[in-house]
Each structure stands twice: as C-alpha cells, then as structure tokens.
C-alpha cells in the first residue's frame, strides 16, 4: 500500500508504521558527550533534506544508523521519537563501520559505480560484513513496518535489503532508490558479487535510478545475470517504466531524478539577512569583480582539482585577473579514515597553496579554501554572493548543489558551470555544460561564464529556475511513491 496518513494499529508480529524509510544513516546523529551521556543533532546530507519533510508529513518511521559505534549490536534499543519522527536505530560495531561502510560500500561499490576513477578493492571479508549488516537493517525494518506497509529503501549501502525484507515480510510493498550513478554493464560485471546485488535489488517492487541510462543498464543485467524476461522498450524520465518478470511477480524499473526543496530555498535566499550576509562575504573577499564558488564534499569524484587547475591556468594566461577575481572552495570533510580521501585532501591543499603562492598577495589570496561544514544559511549567502558556480564532477548521480544555487538566484544573476557527467545536466540544459576531462574546454567555459552579458545570464538563469522550481523534491517523492503504489499491496 502507498503511505497513508499515520501509524497503523499494531498487529502481533508486525510493527506500527505504515510508511518506513530505510537508509544508512538516521536523519539525526547521536553524539557521546564528555560525561558519557548522549545527545542528538541534525545530520547533514542531501538524502536527509529530501526525505525528512515527506516522512514527517506521513508520521512514518526511519530506520538507520545513529552515527556512533556500539559493540552491543545484538541488543535492540527502543524506538526514539525526535521532533515527531519515529527513529529505529540500527547499531554498528567498529568492525561493521570498517568493513561494511568504509570497506565494501565506499572502497568497493563507490569507486565501481563512479566509473572506476579510483580502483575498487574486492575483499571477501568486506562482502561478508555487507551481507550481515544488510540483514540487520532488514530485520529492524521488519519489526518497524505494519502489515501491508510501504517501505522505501535508500542507496548503495543497502542493496541486499529488498530481497532480505521480501523473504521476511512478503506482505510489504518495497521500493528501492539508488542515489549514485548505476555503472555501465561492463564495469558492473567486474564485481565478484554482481549476481547477488542484482537479486537483492529485485526483491523490490520498484527499483529507481536518477537517469534512464541506469535503468536500462539494470534491465540488461537482469536478463544477463538472472535470465529474467524484461521489457525491451526505452525507459522514460518519470514515465515509461521497464519491467523484470520473475516467477511470481513483476518488478518495475524507472528513472526519477531527485531534486531539492526549491521553494523553501528560494524564500530563504530572498530574506534581508541573507542578502546582507552575501554583501558582507563579498566585502570580506575584498569586493572582487567576480566571485567563483565551489561547494562539495571532499571526494575524488567531485573534480575539485579540475576547477583549481583551470583557474590557475586562466590566471597564468591573463584570462582571469588576479586583482579582481577570486575562487572560494568550501570542502566538507568526508570519509577521512579512507586512504584515498586522505591523499585527496593533501593534494587539494597543496594545489591551493601553490595557486596562492603564485598569484596571491599578502592578505589577498586568490583561492579561499575552507575544509569544514558550513551552516545552512551561511551556505545560502555564499550562493547569493557568487557570480559563477563551479560544479565539475567527473561523475555524479545528480548533484543537488547545482539545483540549490539556481534556487537561490531569484535576482536572475550568476552563472552555473556544470559537468556533463552529472545527473543534473540532463535537466539543466541552460547551464554552461562542460566536459571536466577537457581542461581547455573547462577554461573556455569558465571564461565565457565570467564574461557573459547581463541579458545572456538572465536568459539562462530564468530557464534554469523554471526547471528547478517546477521539479522539486516533493514532485520527485510523489512520482516515485505513486509508481510504487501502482505495484499494489502484497498479501502475506
């Protein structure tokens, strides 16, 4: 059944939530305080931003890890209610975090799904832990869900949960959405556990991807690895779903590009305090003629090095002026215990130091670099202050930062430079699209964005805003859940 208006009556052997979201993390983080007690704080991330309002309206439950290590994984804590959200914590031990999360999820699946920018590592011990933790999530979800409930499983860390949950609770309607790219078939085939992953996903009634290409790849793999009959027609965006025929049921496969709460962002960005802070930011930067901005997790997929290299060469060639152009890079710390991420941070900070050493002046660097989280309203002020937004990933499932920047520009100012290899590029066609592997092309595109006329900038931004404001996160969730509801309830 589709999510209803609240928590159902509890039935023996079932939970009491008619709608359950399952994700690697809860929408709040648990912290241990110096006195040994614990406290909760809101956790960052696009997934939380996208799903929390929907779940709150539905008064459902959220199953996820609270963010702290707990060796007593067999002891189940009672559900927690925070701001009218029922939270179902799943405990992870230090070994779970090392092998399931940092290992299989982020050193095996993440690089494989992002076109092998970094070589994936295949360890059988990591796979075994991934299976065990996915089962723990499935069991926690089974305990939370009311009879006939709708369950929405999120992302690459939990790709085995749909099949495990189907086995435990055939009465449930199960959806799965992948928030990162789904790789080309020839890359996915490298995975030693490729068949198990596909079977895991086929436990869902609906499997969703950002783009039609990911959906088509999954249909092909279902034929090749499972021997299933599948639809052969093209999958459409938010329409024309593919189908995988199993022995007793049909799994639908679709493309549902995620978005943001664009109306809320638009309203916040118009606020007088945000506008004042944006002016202050420009003043603190020395009132340059042009401000370029990058906002990313510090991740090797994001192409931060590409934009820094392009900016450095534009300065060297005199195509950007060191006395009136600055670049601000906000880099949120990410996966700091993973070797490739530690190396990336060293490389980026060395690059920033080199550029400032070559082109900056005392008290006036040309690159301003922050390696820490930035409060939400401060980030919005940076969006309002920036003349050019640089979004240059080598591969990205969607990239919500691009949409957030557009939502904040009610003044129709600014320019968006956007990698062709983001999901967002399929929708934001009036951005300055760029191939991040083509450095000369990146330089030319950034220069064009810096020098665009007011009329050209307003024309592009008006079109971008029309797209982003019309296709918001509510529409994304609605389109997925409507398609999931059409799968119908399952009788146990």
Curated annotation (Swiss-Prot):
SUPFAM superfamilies in UniProt: UDP-Glycosyltransferase/glycogen phosphorylase (SSF53756)
Pfam families per the UniProt record, alphabetical: Glyco_transf_20 (PF00982)
Annotated catalysed reactions: ADP-alpha-D-glucose + D-glucose 6-phosphate = alpha,alpha-trehalose 6-phosphate + ADP + H(+); CDP-alpha-D-glucose + D-glucose 6-phosphate = alpha,alpha-trehalose 6-phosphate + CDP + H(+); GDP-alpha-D-glucose + D-glucose 6-phosphate = alpha,alpha-trehalose 6-phosphate + GDP + H(+); TDP-alpha-D-glucose + D-glucose 6-phosphate = 5-methyl-UDP + alpha,alpha-trehalose 6-phosphate + H(+)
Residue numbers binding D-glucose 6-phosphate: 25, 101, 155, 335
Residues reported to bind UDP-alpha-D-glucose: 45-46, 297, 302, 400-404
Site positions (Involved in alpha anomer selectivity): 110, 180
Record flagged with keyword Glycosyltransferase: yes
GO molecular function: alpha,alpha-trehalose-phosphate synthase (GDP-forming) activity; alpha,alpha-trehalose-phosphate synthase (UDP-forming) activity; trehalose-phosphatase activity
An example Gene Ontology CC term for this record: cytosol
Keyword Transferase: yes
Domain of life: Bacteria
Protein family membership: Belongs to the glycosyltransferase 20 family.
Stored PANTHER family: BCDNA.GH08860 (PTHR10788:SF106), TREHALOSE-6-PHOSPHATE SYNTHASE (PTHR10788)
Biological function: Probably involved in the osmoprotection via the biosynthesis of trehalose and in the production of glycogen and alpha-glucan via the TreS-Pep2 branch involved in the biosynthesis of maltose-1-phosphate (M1P). Catalyzes the transfer of glucose from UDP-glucose (UDP-Glc) to D-glucose 6-phosphate (Glc-6-P) to form trehalose-6-phosphate. Probably also able to use ADP-Glc, CDP-Glc, GDP-Glc and TDP-Glc as glucosyl donors.
Oligomer and partners: Homotetramer.
Protein name stated in the entry: Trehalose-6-phosphate synthase
Species this protein is from: Mycolicibacterium paratuberculosis (strain ATCC BAA-968 / K-10)
């Amino acid at each position: 059944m589709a999510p209803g208006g609240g928590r159902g009556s509890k039935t023996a052997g079932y939970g009491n939530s008619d709608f359950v979201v399952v994700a690697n993390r809860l929408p709040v983080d648990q912290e241990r305080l110096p006195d040994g007690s614990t406290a909760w704080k809101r956790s960052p991330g696009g997934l939380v931003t996208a799903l929390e309002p929907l779940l709150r309206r539905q008064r459902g439950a959220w199953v996820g890890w609270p963010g702290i290590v707990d060796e007593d994984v067999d002891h189940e804590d009672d559900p927690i209610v925070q701001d009218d959200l029922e939270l179902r914590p799943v405990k992870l031990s230090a070994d779970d975090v090392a092998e399931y999360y940092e290992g299989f999820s982020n050193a095996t699946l993440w690089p494989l799904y992002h076109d092998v920018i970094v070589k994936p590592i295949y360890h059988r011990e990591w796979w075994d832990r991934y299976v065990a933790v996915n089962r723990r999530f499935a069991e926690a979800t089974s305990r939370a869900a009311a009879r006939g409930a709708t369950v929405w499983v999120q992302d690459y860390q939990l790709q085995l949960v749909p099949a495990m949950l189907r086995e435990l609770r055939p009465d449930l309607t199960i959806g799965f959405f992948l928030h990162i790219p789904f790789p080309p078939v020839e890359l996915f085939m490298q995975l030693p556990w490729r068949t198990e992953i596909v079977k895991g996903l086929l436990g869902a009634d609906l499997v969703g991807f950002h783009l039609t290409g990911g959906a088509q790849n999954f249909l092909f793999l279902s034929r090749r690895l499972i021997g299933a009959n599948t639809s052969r027609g093209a999958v459409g965006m938010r329409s024309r779903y593919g189908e995988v025929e199993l022995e007793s049921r049909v799994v639908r496969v679709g493309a549902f590009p995620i978005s943001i709460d664009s109306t809320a962002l638009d309203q916040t960005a118009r606020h007088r305090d945000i506008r004042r802070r944006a002016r202050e930011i420009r003043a603190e930067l020395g009132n340059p003629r042009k401000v370029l901005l990058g906002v990313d997790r510090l991740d090797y997929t994001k192409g931060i090095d590409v934009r820094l290299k392009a900016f450095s060469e534009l300065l060297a060639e005199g195509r950007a002026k060191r006395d009136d152009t600055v670049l601000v890079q906000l880099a949120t710390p990410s996966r700091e215990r993973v070797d490739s991420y530690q190396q990336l941070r060293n490389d980026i900070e060395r690059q920033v130091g080199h550029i400032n050493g070559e082109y900056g002046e005392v008290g006036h660097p040309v690159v301003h670099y922050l390696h820490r989280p930035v409060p939400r309203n401060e980030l919005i002020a940076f969006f309002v202050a920036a003349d050019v937004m640089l979004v240059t990933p080598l591969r990205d499932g969607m990239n919500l930062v691009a949409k957030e920047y557009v939502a904040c520009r009610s003044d129709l100012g600014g320019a968006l430079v956007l990698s062709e290899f983001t999901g967002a590029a399929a929708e934001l066609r009036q951005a300055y699209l760029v191939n991040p592997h083509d450095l000369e092309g990146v330089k030319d595109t950034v220069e064009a964005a810096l020098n665009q006329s007011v009329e050209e900038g307003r024309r592009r931004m008006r079109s971008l805003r029309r797209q982003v404001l019309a296709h918001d996160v509510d529409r994304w969730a609605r389109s997925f859940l409507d398609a999931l509801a059409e799968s119908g309830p399952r009788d146990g």
